[in-house]
Amino acid sequence: MSQSPTNVPRSYNSVLDLKLASPTNSASGATGGWIVQKFGGTSVGKFPENIVDNIVKVYSQTNRVAVVCSARSSQTKSEGTTSRLLRSADLAENDKDYQPLLNAIEEDHVTNAERIQSEEIKQELIKDTKQEIEHVRELLHACQIIGEISPRSLDSIMAVGEKLSCLFMTALMKDHGLNAVYINLQDVIPLSYDFQKGFDDSFYQFLSQEIGKRVLQCDKEREGEEDVIPVLTGYFGVVPGGLLNGVGRGYTDLCAALAAVALQADELQIWKEVDGIFTADPRKVPNARLLDSVTPEEAAELTYYGSEVIHPFTMEQVIRAKIPIRIKNVENPTGKGTIIYPDNIGRRGEATPPHPPAAFEQLAMSSLLQRKRSATAITAKQDIVVINIHSNKKTLSHGFLAHVFTTLDKYKLVVDLISTSEVHVSMALSIQSDQESQLKHALVDLRKMGTVDVTKKMTIVSLVGKQMVNFIGIAGNMFKVLADEKINIEMISQGANEINISAVINEKDTIRALKSIHAKLLEGGSAIGDSSAVDTRLEALKLS
């Protein structure tokens, strides 16, 4: 008799949860569609057995599962494998000794292989690990001789982090009885690919198709075997100018998104070390609540202004394909998590949704009849520098602004918020410790245009909510809360899409501002007004 798998969510926060709990699904083989699960480097470093036994193994009982892994991190991203590989490359380029750092990476991964019980699988993993590290040594030696590292070489060095992580997770899954297969995507982009159009939609469509082909080819080669679990490297090949410059450190999320699109997945799952998206950072605001769902627009704003959710560009790929994204916690796999719903639940041009309305009728009432809210969440972005420039009037206003932005672009400084008049500009910039030198040089150039005042140690506090556009007085309420707390506002801004209201305040007031705004606008009496866009779509679907 078929049984529902254990350790699955009992609050049906998505159609996938319904499949997992359904008694009609066999525990011996997957009957549902694909799901793509992306695991970050810290999760792979700290909780690999939990990932295999309580997540991949459980979901693979009812669905086809594809896994994408970031490079392994034992504690923090700064001490992760990718960061250490990049530091090794920097040492080699400057003719310094990179061997100790590379030896530490090798030792860390070989030691980690001791988690594998099967001696055969363990020794194979150690052999593969040492081969990858030796490849990096050869590359770094060559780069040290010529005194420079090309973007292509840097990509190849950086790719080893994802390879080592996926080799380990594949071995661990095999050790725990799963039919996992390692798929290296390093050469998924052919050398003949024409990049004349750059990173446009056609490139990502092509890349998605190629990733899908690799997965389906793997299936075909193992036809007749128990359902294969492909483990994909988050790194997906050499691109002009380098992957870091072209995509950034979020390339693993992007790879998972493209795989989900290619496989027409039921869901893309992003597994982190938090339960989902909260109304505020629970480390700073103890009363913060877990959100059952947010819209893509809200998730994008929260990501940009301080909450690490998922990169907006990555999210765009799956939202366009009408695939839900679920944020879940590797330490609490049975938790509800947070769903990011597409704007239109139907997908691929269909008039009807991908899943029958009857399934949605069984969704948790918390998803269908969410509390009506004016704002969704409050977030903070620290390490902000405010620059005020008053023109010396030697240039016209358009020339003044052009000079300002040209200077910022020259030193690769990004503006988070800006307020302008004909002869005055106020800007809030996020400046990390490794950008201090660029900021210093930029200020020298900016002072040629007029008087420049700089204020450091500031924070951008942002109130986010798609329904705020329908409420009168939200901005006034937010600023009144700050005034009541005697918190001075340096700058204010409202996004053109009207789902984000931001204020720049002193960094020392950050926690007090978050707590007070959360208490007054996101708790209790704030639950008034129209329902969220997600509520409206799901309710309409329920009644159809």
UniProtKB/Swiss-Prot annotation:
GO terms for cellular component: cytosol. Keywords: Amino-acid biosynthesis, ATP-binding, Kinase, Methionine biosynthesis, Nucleotide-binding, Threonine biosynthesis, Transferase. PROSITE patterns: ACT, ASPARTOKINASE. The keyword Cell membrane does not apply. Pathway: Amino-acid biosynthesis; L-methionine biosynthesis via de novo pathway; L-homoserine from L-aspartate: step 1/3; Amino-acid biosynthesis; L-threonine biosynthesis; L-threonine from L-aspartate: step 1/5. It holds the Pfam family ACT_9. InterPro entries: AceGlu_kinase-like_sf, ACT-like_dom_sf, ACT_Aspartokinase, ACT_dom, Asp/Glu/Uridylate_kinase, Asp_kinase, Aspartate_kinase_CS. It is an enzyme of class 2 (transferase). It catalyses: L-aspartate + ATP = 4-phospho-L-aspartate + ADP. Disruption phenotype: Sensitive to sulfometuron methyl (a compound that increases flux through the threonine biosynthetic pathway). Does not decrease survival in a mouse model of infection. Residues 463-535 form the ACT domain. Coiled coil: none annotated. GO terms for molecular function: aspartate kinase activity; ATP binding. GO terms for biological process: 'de novo' L-methionine biosynthetic process; homoserine biosynthetic process; threonine biosynthetic process. Its EC number is 2.7.2.4. Belongs to the aspartokinase family. Phosphorylates aspartate, the first step in the biosynthesis of amino acids that derive from aspartate (the aspartate family of amino acids), including methioinine and threonine, the latter of which is a precursor to isoleucine. This is Aspartokinase. It comes from Candida albicans (strain SC5314 / ATCC MYA-2876). The gene is HOM3.
